[in-house]
Amino acid sequence: PFDPTEIKNYHNELIAKLAQKVDRDMPGSDRLIALAYRNGQYPLVTLMLKNAKENGLTAWVRAKMALRAGDVNAAAAWYAKAAASFPPNETWGFQSYSDDIVGEEFVTPVCRIHAEQAILALNRDDYLQAMRLMYQAKENYWPDVAHIAERVLTVNELLAFVDKYVPAPSPSAPTTPKNAGRDSADARLRNLLARRL
């Protein structure tokens, strides 16, 4: 099915069938928990997390559930565990357009987690930490990095950040078809800083 309502109904039926085994952990239960969370079945998520083995995905869902419960400190701790659990080069492929995402997004779990951590830091008014976290997700979330760099940080904060975290440009790297016509996030951030100065 390609209709969003049909897909959600299919997911709900699948979750209901598989959730009959929530009294114990089973292979793939972390994915079932994530699917239940995504479909808004939060009581089921809470129930399933009681028996789930800890891994990056369950830590990530626990972070989201802690945010739903208003426990920002617990959410931050779970996000840290989740971020440490995924290899930086793990990818899950494309996520199609939805109400939350405009266009396709190439899902890299650690990038997504860092971006969510950055939003949490922004809500705590910890702007430099937000920039550090969002910068770790720079290739996937460049518009968010640019927004923080341009609209949130002061010029001096941005200058200090670039000096500390952004590698100096390499001397005229040859243009290859892979990177032709597009500067790296590092180069774009340096250009943004130059414009602000």
Where are these regions (language model features)?
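Alpha-helical solenoid repeat scaffolds
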Residues: P1-L197
